[in-house]
């Protein structure tokens, strides 16, 4: 085979290889987008009850069952007034939420503290726009209210524990009055 023919064949093979790489990459992108959309469709978005959460997401149930409340956490919960309320923005797809939301639910299971849970999509939004209004950037975000006034936030994970951090926020808000 002459040098000219070899060069022509090599150019053809390089073009063919590049074309195959472009097609393979395009198929990979399409598959990734479809997989992401399928996963997102499985996630509840908006207001969600403890029962809905536990019915649809077994990781939350097992983390709830496995969590043992310390005596310090139990004491902190007991010291909170009933005027404390919580708004929890989280994702059923978020590993931090899978850890922290069950801990919160177990810590506050025997209190009159009101807990509103709002499940977010992968873009950290929900149809009513409450996440955007509350400037939610990370999940989970626990917004703590006393007498309907925001007194603090716990973002992704507490410093000590959820109940102890919430009690500290409450005490700080009282000291500032």
Features from the language model and the residues they span:
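Bacterial N-terminal signal peptides
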Residues: 21-32
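N-terminal leader/targeting and pre-domain segments
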Residues: 38-81
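Short active-site neighborhood of thiol/selenol oxidoreductases, capturing the structured segment around
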Residues: 82-92
């Amino acid at each position: 085979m002459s040098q000219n023919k070899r060069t022509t064949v090599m150019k053809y093979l390089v073009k063919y290889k590049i074309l195959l790489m472009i097609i393979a990459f395009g198929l990979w992108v399409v598959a990734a987008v479809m997989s992401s959309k399928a996963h997102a469709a499985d996630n509840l978005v908006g207001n969600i009850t403890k029962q809905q959460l536990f019915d649809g997401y077994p990781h939350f149930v097992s983390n709830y069952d496995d969590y043992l409340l310390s005596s310090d956490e139990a004491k902190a919960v007991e010291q909170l007034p009933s005027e404390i309320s919580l708004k929890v923005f989280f994702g059923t797809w978020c590993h931090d939420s899978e850890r922290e939301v069950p801990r919160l639910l177990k810590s506050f299971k025997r209190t009159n503290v009101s807990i509103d849970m709002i499940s977010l999509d992968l873009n950290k939004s929900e149809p009513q726009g409450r996440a955007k209004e509350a400037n939610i950037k990370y999940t989970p975000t626990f917004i703590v209210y006393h007498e309907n006034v925001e007194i603090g936030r716990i973002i992704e994970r507490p410093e000590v524990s959820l109940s102890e951090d919430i009690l500290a926020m409450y005490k700080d808000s009282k000291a500032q009055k």
